[in-house]
Design a protein with these regions (language model features):
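Transmembrane alpha-helix boundary and packing residues in multipass membrane permease domains
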Residues: 24, 28, 40, 44, ...
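Alpha-helical transmembrane segments of multipass membrane proteins
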Residues: 36-39, 111, 119, 153-157, ...
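Small-residue-rich hydrophobic transmembrane alpha-helices
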Residues: 51-111, 148-167
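Alpha-helical transmembrane segments of multi-pass membrane transporters
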Residues: 113, 152, 166-182
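Residue-level signal for short hydrophobic patches within transmembrane helices
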Residues: 10, 14-33, 37, 60-67, ...
Length: 182
């Protein structure tokens, strides 16, 4: 394999599965770990109402993940199809379009959450004791939704290019920054 060649087109599937599985599993473990760290910090500093507030807001994290995966995996699949056809120009346009969609949808979600925050929190099950905590937490964290969405989608696009370790490194840096900012 040439150094600049994408391994997805030239290496055996068994080798690719091993090479892709380890960084992906590490990234998932890191993600789970920093969610646990968040809960520990919030529980110790605010208490059970703080933990309840983050749980009420959690569906919005899943929306971010869903949007990121939708655009990231879709863009990555089309990127790989184009690369398989030896059409790098169209492959680049799919990546560019995916990144644009990630950013645009991230901003739209952030604005929608800011505009409809209280009704959303009530819809997600916030009680009178928790609603103010949930709104405060979500108003702050929603500012980061565009970045989260671009990161999730971008890591799929990076992996499609065969840059597994770089994708994993980006996830690790995100987890470390998240922990420090807590």
């Amino acid at each position: 394999m040439k150094p600049s060649e994408n391994p997805l087109g030239s290496e055996p599937i068994s080798t690719l599965l091993r090479r892709f599985a380890v960084p992906s599993v590490i990234a998932m473990l890191v993600s789970a770990l920093y969610n646990m760290v968040d809960q520990l910090f919030i529980g110790h500093s605010i208490g059970v109402l703080g933990n309840a507030a983050t749980n009420v807001a959690f569906p919005l994290s899943m929306v971010c993940t869903s949007i990121g995966l939708l655009c990231g995996i879709g863009g990555a699949a089309n990127f790989n199809l184009c690369m398989g056809r030896k059409d790098p120009e169209h492959a680049k346009s799919y990546v560019g379009n995916a990144i644009s969609m990630l950013a645009i949808l991230g901003v739209i979600l952030c604005v929608a959450v800011q505009l409809f925050l209280r009704p959303m929190m009530l819809l997600f099950g916030a009680t009178p004791d928790v609603i103010d905590y949930a709104c405060t937490y979500t108003r702050i964290t929603s500012i980061g939704f565009p970045f989260l969405i671009v990161t999730i989608g971008g890591s799929n696009l990076i992996r499609a290019d065969g840059s597994l370790k770089f994708s994993m490194l980006c996830n690790l840096v995100g987890a470390i920054v998240n922990t420090i900012l807590d």
